[in-house]
Each structure stands twice: as C-alpha cells, then as structure tokens.
C-alpha cells in the first residue's frame, strides 16, 4: 500500500526508556504496529525529536500516532508542526488530557479514521523568536528566572505599545489549548481550547494588582527582561534570553492539528480529567 492517506507515523518519546512505564510502552508499541498493519495502514516509527533530521520521513505520513502521555503528544506536535501534520494520542500514563483514545479503544478509532468519522481540531500555536532562533510552542512559552533569588522584571509590549511590567518569578504566555496546563496551576483562567487568544499569567508577582490577562491573537507581542532569563517551551525545551534582549511571540501561521473522536466534548473532558465544577471531596 502506497497511499499517503494510509500511512501513520508512530511516535514514542525518545526518553521513554527512563520512564517507569517503559516495559508497558515497549509492549504497547509492538501491539500498535501489528494493529496498524492488520487495519491496512502503512506505518513507521519515530523516536527522535529532531524534525529537521526526520523531515523526509515526516512528509510520508498522513498523521502521527503518539504513544504515551500529554508530554509525548506535545513533543510530536512541535516536531511535526512545520509540516502541517495532524497527531492523535493513545494514552499510556496518567492524565491524558490531549489524548484521543485509550489503548483498548484504538482499533475502533482506526476504523473510524478509515471511514472519515474522526474530527480534525485546529488550535492556535505560538511562534517565538529570540535573535535568529525561531521555535513553536503548543501549550506555552515561559519566561523564568535564571537565579533562585531576586525578582525578574519583564517589560511587555503589544506591537510597539508597552502595556505592562511584570515583577516576580516570571511570566507564562499560554495558548487556549495550554490554558489547562501550567497556566492553570499558576491560577490562570481556563480558556476554551478553540479560542483565538493569548493568556498572560504572572508567576508569583510582587504586586497585588497584577492579574492574568487574555489578549486577542491579532497582536504581535514582545518581552524584555532586565537580566538574563530562561525561555521554556512546553516544559520540554529551553533557550537563553539575555538581559534586554527581545523575545517576540506571535500567532503561528500553522495551526496545531489534533485528530479526535466526533463525540469528544471539551467541557466533558474538563469534568472527567480535571474534576471541573466537582466537589473537592468527590472520589474519582
């Protein structure tokens, strides 16, 4: 079979051998490859985060099956983002907020995929730039202190207009899809995953008046820190940000693409995965 629409890349995070679920992942990987063949799909494995190195291989796939948790899906989405390829997650692990299906439901999902009974969700992604270095973020870009002590001053601009100076441990710039990740842990708002906006949430801000801010995605943002800082991408990659060096962030021209069941409902996922609106005493 040479049909591009029948070719699925299987992504397992390259550090999975360090995972407590290593044995389960290895067994699941072999089972998944066999199932794909039985269902009439061509498949290949990718266990690297180097999208440039695997560019030709990535182009061969219609979509990518991400075997693991949300971290695995985030890594795959960044790796394939420039190639405009959709991904879907098969959960092995704990939360699985982004996952499309459990392992025991994969066969039905693949059959629905063949019959075009799967929906494609397109989400806003961030494109960041420091000097000549560009990168994509699916959940968030974080500007964080390099030093354990002291306060980091971050000047924020929308276009050429300064609108705030944050003084604290740092700043989260999240996507709506990422609003339920680090942003939520830092007491930022939940924003519907299909919205077109940025969420700016300060980390341990020095001022009582600072609150999270939601901005329309039409803005091009820039940030400067008064001293050397770290820029963290989806909690997985880091870049150095020199004092007074601008970090530019804008809406990526390419969307984050996730394949999901037609029956998936965002509010239901919030309730099931995060116990949204439930009593704190309710047992899962």
Curated annotation (Swiss-Prot):
Catalytic activity: NAD(+) + ATP = ADP + NADP(+) + H(+)
Protein residues bound to NAD(+): 70-71, 139-140, 167, 169, 177, 180-185, 236
Main location: cytoplasm
Keywords assigned by UniProt, alphabetized: ATP-binding, Cytoplasm, Kinase, NAD, NADP, Nucleotide-binding, Transferase
Record InterPro entries: ATP-NAD_kinase_N, ATP-NAD_kinase_PpnK-typ_C, NAD/diacylglycerol_kinase_sf, NADK
Top-level EC class: transferase
GO molecular function, one term: NAD+ kinase activity
Keyword Magnesium part of the UniProt annotation: no
Function: Involved in the regulation of the intracellular balance of NAD and NADP, and is a key enzyme in the biosynthesis of NADP. Catalyzes specifically the phosphorylation on 2'-hydroxyl of the adenosine moiety of NAD to yield NADP.
HAMAP family from the UniProt entry: NAD_kinase (MF_00361)
Name of the protein this chain belongs to: NAD kinase
Phylogenetic lineage: Bacteria, Pseudomonadati, Campylobacterota, Epsilonproteobacteria, Campylobacterales
């Amino acid at each position: 079979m040479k049909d591009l629409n029948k070719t699925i890349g299987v992504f397992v995070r390259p550090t999975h051998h360090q995972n407590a679920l290593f044995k389960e992942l290895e067994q699941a990987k072999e089972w998944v490859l066999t199932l794909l063949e039985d269902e009439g799909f061509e498949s290949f494995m990718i266990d690297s985060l180097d999208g440039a190195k695997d560019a030709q291989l990535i182009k061969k796939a219609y979509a990518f099956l991400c075997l693991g948790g949300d971290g695995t899906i985030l890594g795959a989405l960044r790796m394939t983002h420039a190639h405009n390829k959709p991904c879907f997650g098969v959960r092995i692990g704990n939360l699985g907020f982004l996952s499309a299906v459990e392992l025991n439901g994969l066969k039905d999902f693949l059959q629905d995929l063949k019959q075009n009974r799967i929906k494609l969700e397109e989400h806003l992604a961030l494109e960041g730039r420091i000097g000549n270095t560009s990168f994509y973020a699916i959940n968030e870009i974080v500007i964080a202190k390099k030093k354990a002590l002291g306060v980091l001053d971050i000047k924020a601009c929308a276009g050429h207009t300064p609108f705030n100076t944050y003084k604290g441990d740092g700043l989260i710039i999240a996507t709506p899809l990422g609003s339920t990740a680090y942003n939520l842990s830092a007491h930022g708002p939940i924003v519907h995953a299909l919205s077109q906006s940025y969420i700016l949430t300060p980390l341990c801000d020095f001022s009582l008046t600072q609150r999270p801010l939601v901005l329309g995605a039409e803005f091009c943002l820039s940030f400067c820190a008064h001293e050397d800082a770290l820029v963290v991408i989806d909690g997985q990659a880091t870049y150095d940000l020199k004092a007074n060096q601008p970090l530019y962030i804008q809406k990526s021209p390419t969307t984050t693409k996730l394949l999901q069941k037609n029956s998936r409902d965002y509010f239901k996922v919030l309730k099931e995965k995060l116990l949204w609106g439930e009593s704190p005493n309710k047992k899962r």
